[in-house]
Amino acid sequence: MRMFRITACLPSPSKIRTQRELQNTFFTKLVPYDAWFREQQRIQKLGGKIIKVELATGRPNTNTGLL
């Protein structure tokens, strides 16, 4: 199965409401090839930024730090 390994940064939702210090959350995730556009839109709607995209093979919901 073709998958993308994406690394993205999202602002923390709890800090946005109080308008204090913004704290960013970085994460790495495996996304299926067919769902890439939907995931990209979701990250951008939340005000996040996509840092890195790589082609990967593997199973969804696995820790990509160990690959």
Curated annotation (Swiss-Prot):
PROSITE patterns: CPCD_LIKE. It comes from Synechococcus sp. (strain ATCC 27144 / PCC 6301 / SAUG 1402/1). It is a peripheral membrane protein. SMART domains: CpcD. Residues 1-56 form the CpcD-like domain. GO terms for cellular component: phycobilisome; plasma membrane-derived thylakoid membrane. It holds the Pfam family CpcD. This is Phycobilisome 7.8 kDa linker polypeptide, allophycocyanin-associated, core. Its main location: membrane. Rod linker protein, associated with allophycocyanin. Linker polypeptides determine the state of aggregation and the location of the disk-shaped phycobiliprotein units within the phycobilisome and modulate their spectroscopic properties in order to mediate a directed and optimal energy transfer. It comes from the Bacteria. It is found in: Cellular thylakoid membrane. The keyword RNA-binding does not apply.
